[in-house]
Swiss-Prot record:
Catalyzes the attachment of serine to tRNA(Ser). Is also able to aminoacylate tRNA(Sec) with serine, to form the misacylated tRNA L-seryl-tRNA(Sec), which will be further converted into selenocysteinyl-tRNA(Sec). The gene is serS. ATP binds at R262, S263, E264, E349, I350, S351, S352. This is Serine--tRNA ligase. GO terms for cellular component: cytoplasm. Pathway: Aminoacyl-tRNA biosynthesis; selenocysteinyl-tRNA(Sec) biosynthesis; L-seryl-tRNA(Sec) from L-serine and tRNA(Sec): step 1/1.
């Protein structure tokens, strides 16, 4: 949520920045009109209250002097009724303004590239060499089926499309990746480990920005009004909802493994095969709470933590700075990490690392005090995938495949796999 004072004092500047996002400005313009009416009502109400006070004093004086006060009493009744009417309208406008405010996205940071589509995202750097195969490489869904480590068919029978059973060494590979990522982030990168709830309430989804605008993308348990989490970002960020933190306790850095649940409502027909776009998938998340002046340096470090996972797995990747049109609702600046997937002959997103500035903190009321007794300020929140597990498995299977259909295990994972160096075809 944006600072309402910023909207009121810099309306045209904010409007231009939202235009750079490609936003429909209808609601934003409505905010300006309603806010103008609100200011008019406040001025009128204050004038009427002042008039009421004056009339009240006049009535008291008339009564002390034993004079007829009926006309003044009637005047005060009319003024009072008008104040009540204006107060009702003011409350209704405030409710409408709050609703609109929750639907306005974050303002892009000045360093975010201005663009109209994903084609305008800017490549920052690349790492690793894309492998040249001397045989026809298979897609990960075929490799997983042939190796008997991924079963999409029975998952479709048990649940439906966009689900998978990990089996045998496939399940062990996923578990190895989880342990490797969590160990790296907690032992070397200084993150505190968490295992969060997989269901959250409506206030939590609102706090991180999924609600109210993107409710159709979420899985709702209607009987309880709980949501299955789309990412561990939601419970971990809301861990500090309504908290006032101490300055000396910042930054707070958390890493959390969780299952993630997404309806993929807007993705019909896209990535229908394999692990790239599932309704349920595992992910390791990185979340930070920092002082405002530290958030952009923190974003660079957080992105580096996600990159380190790919480097140790020796998977080729690139980093993109996302343009204003591809920024997402909550971020002021976002980097995407894309890993090379041979079956797509392209890089595919495996992590997003974002600085939300105070956008989420305002929605969730997460603040800190610089000194005891000082006025609380909003923290800046950041998060990043460190990494998405299904896409990491897909990248490993495709990039580490051999001509005989087997798949090598990345060296950094072999200790987590009990020394297994290769997944071979069943005999």
């Amino acid at each position: 949520m944006l600072d309402v004072k910023l909207l009121r004092n810099n309306f045209e500047e904010v409007k231009q920045k939202l235009q750079n996002r490609g936003e429909d400005l209808g609601e934003f313009e409505k905010f300006g009109e309603l806010d103008k009416r609100r200011r008019t009502l406040i001025v009128e109400t204050e004038a009427l209250k002042s008039q009421r006070n004056e009339v009240s004093q006049e009535i008291a004086k008339l009564k002390r002097e034993k004079q007829d006060a009926d006309a003044k009493i009637e005047e005060m009744r009319v003024v009072g009724d008008r104040i009540k009417t204006l107060d009702i309208e003011l409350r209704e406008i405030d409710e409408k303004l709050d609703t609109i405010l929750m639907s306005i996205p974050n303002i892009p940071h000045e360093s975010t590239p201005v663009g109209e589509s994903e084609d305008d995202n800017v490549e920052i750097r690349k790492w690793g060499e894309v492998r040249e195969f001397d045989f026809e490489p298979k897609a990960h869904w075929d490799l997983g089926t042939d190796l008997d480590i991924l079963d999409f068919e029975n998952a479709a029978k048990v649940t439906g499309s966009r689900f998978v059973f990990y089996k045998k060494l496939g399940a062990r590979l996923e578990r190895a990746l989880i342990n490797f990522m969590m160990d790296l982030h907690s032992n070397e990168h200084g993150y505190e480990e968490m295992l969060p709830p997989y269901m959250v309430n409506r206030a939590s989804m609102t706090g991180t920005g999924q609600l109210p605008k993107f409710e159709e993308d979420a899985f709702l348990i209607e009987a309880e009004d709980y949501f299955l989490i789309p990412t561990a970002e939601v419970p971990v960020t809301n861990y500090h909802r309504e908290d006032i933190l101490k300055a000396e306790d910042l930054p707070r850095k958390y890493t959390a493994f969780s299952a993630c649940f997404r309806s993929e409502a807007g993705s019909a027909g896209r990535d229908t095969r394999g692990l790239i776009r599932q309704h349920q998938f595992n992910k390791v998340e990185l979340v930070q709470f920092v002082k405002p002046e530290d958030s952009y340096a923190a974003l660079e470090k957080l992105t580096g933590c996600a990159e380190e996972v790919l480097r140790r797995l020796e998977l080729p990747y690139r980093v993109l700075s996302m343009c204003t049109a591809d920024l997402g609702f909550t971020a002021a600046k976002k980097y995407d990490l894309e890993v090379w997937i041979p079956s797509y002959d392209s890089y595919r997103e495996i992590s997003s690392c974002s600085n939300f500035e105070s956008f989420q903190a305002r929605r969730a009321n997460i603040r800190f005090r610089r000194e005891p007794g000082s006025k609380p300020e909003y923290v800046h929140t950041l998060n990043g995938s460190g990494l998405a597990l299904g896409r990491t498995v897909a990248a490993i299977l495709e990039n580490y495949q051999e001509a005989d259909g087997s798949v090598l295990i990345p060296k950094v994972l072999q200790g987590y796999m009990g020394g297994i160096e290769k997944i071979e075809l069943p005999k």
